[in-house]
């Protein structure tokens, strides 16, 4: 009988298990917390190749593995907070890590003093839910490019150039657009906006090329045939070819494949100048291919000739073809610029994709859906990041990625004062929330959240060389918009000064910190692999060495 034996485990209970978790959490949160605020420090990560200098919370969290297995379990929980916040909001990972550490620290003290962990967790959850409702009421919608620039600048570590670049890019591609970040071959950081819909398939044969110098097919006002069928017999498409030739319109065929007699005939007639045609393979695979072909059909006003709906290519009429104002095709990509035949249909399609995007849990599906929305909305901007060294390039790309995510989060749920001020102001609402809680331990949970909320603002001040408690005290007794600007060392209206955080980032940081803290507080034991004893090293040989 085949059997697998599990590794020997080490089990720790009660206070010793909680102390080990706390030690691991503290180590990771200390390393991540160094980067918080405009005067936060960098962390050097010794990775394969040259060391990496980073200022990004989630990157640091993911790089840390502690030698002690029990402490590493605690560190893994903070990694989880950072990753979850990064996935849902794209920024605020350091704030989430600091909040989680504080809630866990004060919570474990209460548990050790005899509080009921389940009631504590319930109190924390109720308090956080009430704070999120308050946050949603207080958030202000983004007004124009100046707000977008301020959000991006703060998130990129006060890099105004990045802020301006992202504001310009979003202005061009719109809120439904996609910003992609690539490495540049030069020292310059530039923005390029790609108009129209791009699909990652090029011409089937280079014989279709109309611009031999650039090896491109370039058409204007082309008719577009879209099908998921394979075209092998020329007789299937002769009626369409005759009609488009009479109209003197170029024809773009997007099909599963064009092969054999059909391809040979198209190429020969193209070279003779009889036909102005190009064939491209359909992008994607399976269900995604069908969805992308439907997107192209809606954009160009074509009727998608789907085999499973009984729409055969040989029966296609000229009215079922779409129109593309401009078509540019290289050996591996096709760009279509079209004026959507039906704006209502296009908007309905975009709304449907947005609904799918909000419901999916898959990161891969989210990226693909966002890409499809952007292509339909007609906006893809590429930020090409340049730097003098590989180390600087990596750091810059991470900052720009944070800025991009923060900007879209701000457009989605609005903005609040930055610099940790929002969390300090929210802490003043907690006494009113506590009054609605009847259980003593639940009220203790509310107190724990209140103490934790001031930690990010205190740490931002501390990283700037100022006494954190003094700063928190001043913010607490100020108006909602007033906070501490660590960059200029002044107390001012942060919304006017451009020190802004997206409300979504603050919300996700608070929710994820409370979620993981609740799990830690209700933990009573840790089970980890027992470290294997090291094999004794061989003694050096005795006697004369030659």
Curated annotation (Swiss-Prot):
Subcellular location per the Swiss-Prot or TrEMBL entry: Plastid, Chloroplast
Gene Ontology biological process terms in this record: protein refolding
Sequence positions bearing Phosphoserine: 50
One of the Pfam families matching this protein, by short name: Cpn60_TCP1
Annotated PROSITE patterns: CHAPERONINS_CPN60
Chief place of localization: plastid
A cellular component annotation (GO) from this entry: chloroplast
Entry keyword set: ATP-binding, Chaperone, Chloroplast, Nucleotide-binding, Phosphoprotein, Plastid, Transit peptide
Disulfide feature: none
Single GO term (MF): ATP binding
InterPro entries named in the record: Chaperonin_Cpn60_CS, Cpn60/GroEL, Cpn60/GroEL/TCP-1, GroEL-like_apical_dom_sf, GROEL-like_equatorial_sf, TCP-1-like_intermed_sf
Location of the transit peptide in the chain: 1-6
Family designation: Belongs to the chaperonin (HSP60) family.
Function: This protein binds RuBisCO small and large subunits and is implicated in the assembly of the enzyme oligomer.
Subunit description: Oligomer of probably six alpha and six beta subunits.
Note in the entry: This protein shows ATPase activity.
Cited HAMAP family: CH60 (MF_00600)
Entry protein name: RuBisCO large subunit-binding protein subunit alpha, chloroplastic
């Amino acid at each position: 009988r085949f059997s697998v034996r599990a590794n020997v485990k080490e089990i720790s209970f009660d206070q010793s298990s909680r102390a080990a978790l706390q030690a691991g959490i503290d180590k990771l949160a200390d390393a991540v917390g160094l980067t918080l605020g405009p005067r936060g420090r960098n962390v050097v990560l010794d990775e394969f190749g040259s060391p990496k200098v980073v200022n990004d919370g989630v990157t640091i969290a993911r790089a840390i593995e502690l030698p002690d297995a029990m402490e590493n379990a605690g560190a893994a929980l903070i990694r989880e907070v950072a990753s979850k916040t990064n996935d849902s909001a794209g920024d605020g990972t350091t704030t989430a890590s600091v909040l989680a550490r504080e809630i866990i620290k004060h919570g474990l003290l209460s548990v050790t003093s005899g509080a009921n962990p389940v009631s504590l967790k319930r109190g924390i959850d109720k308090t956080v839910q009430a704070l999120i409702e308050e946050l949603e009421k207080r958030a202000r919608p983004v007004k124009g490019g100046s707000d977008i620039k301020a959000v991006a600048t703060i998130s990129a570590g006060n890099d105004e150039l990045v802020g301006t670049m992202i504001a310009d890019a979003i202005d061009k591609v719109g809120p439904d657009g996609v910003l992609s970040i690539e490495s540049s071959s030069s020292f310059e950081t530039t923005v390029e906006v790609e108009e129209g819909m791009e699909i990652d398939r090029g011409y089937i044969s280079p014989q279709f090329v109309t611009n031999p110098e650039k090896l491109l097919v370039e058409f204007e006002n082309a008719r577009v045939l879209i099908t998921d069928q394979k075209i092998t017999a020329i007789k299937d498409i002769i009626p369409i070819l005759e009609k488009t030739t009479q109209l003197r319109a170029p024809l773009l065929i997007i099909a599963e494949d064009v092969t054999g007699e059909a391809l040979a005939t198209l190429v020969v007639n193209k070279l003779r100048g009889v036909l102005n045609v190009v064939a491209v393979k359909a992008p994607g695979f399976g269900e995604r291919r069908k969805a992308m072909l439907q997107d192209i059909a809606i954009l160009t006003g074509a009727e998608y000739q789907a085999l499973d709906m009984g729409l055969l290519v040989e029966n296609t009429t000229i009215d079922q073809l779409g129109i593309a104002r401009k078509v540019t095709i290289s050996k591996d990509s096709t760009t279509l610029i079209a004026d959507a035949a039906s704006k209502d249909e296009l908007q309905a399609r975009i709304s449907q994709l947005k609904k799918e995007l909000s419901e999916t849990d898959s990161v891969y599906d989210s990226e693909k859906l966002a890409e499809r929305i952007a292509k339909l909305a007609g906006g893809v901007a590429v930020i090409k990041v340049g730097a003098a060294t590989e180390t600087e390039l990596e750091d810059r790309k991470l900052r720009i990625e944070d800025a991009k995510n923060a900007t879209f989060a701000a457009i989605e749920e609005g903005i609040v004062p930055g610099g940790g001020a929002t969390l300090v102001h929210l802490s003043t609402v907690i006494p009113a929330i506590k009054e609605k809680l009847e259980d003593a331990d639940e009220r203790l949970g509310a107190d724990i959240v209140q103490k934790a909320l001031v930690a990010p603002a205190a740490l931002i001040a501390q990283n700037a060389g100022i006494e954190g408690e003094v700063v928190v005290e001043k913010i607490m007794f100020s108006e909602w918009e007033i906070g501490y600007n660590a960059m200029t060392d002044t107390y001012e209206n942060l919304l006017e000064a451009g020190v802004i955080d997206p409300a979504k980032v603050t919300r996700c940081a608070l929710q994820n910190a409370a979620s993981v803290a609740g799990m830690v507080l209700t933990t009573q034991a840790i089970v980890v692999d027992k470290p294997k004893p090291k094999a004794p090293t061989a003694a050096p040989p005795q006697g004369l060495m030659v």
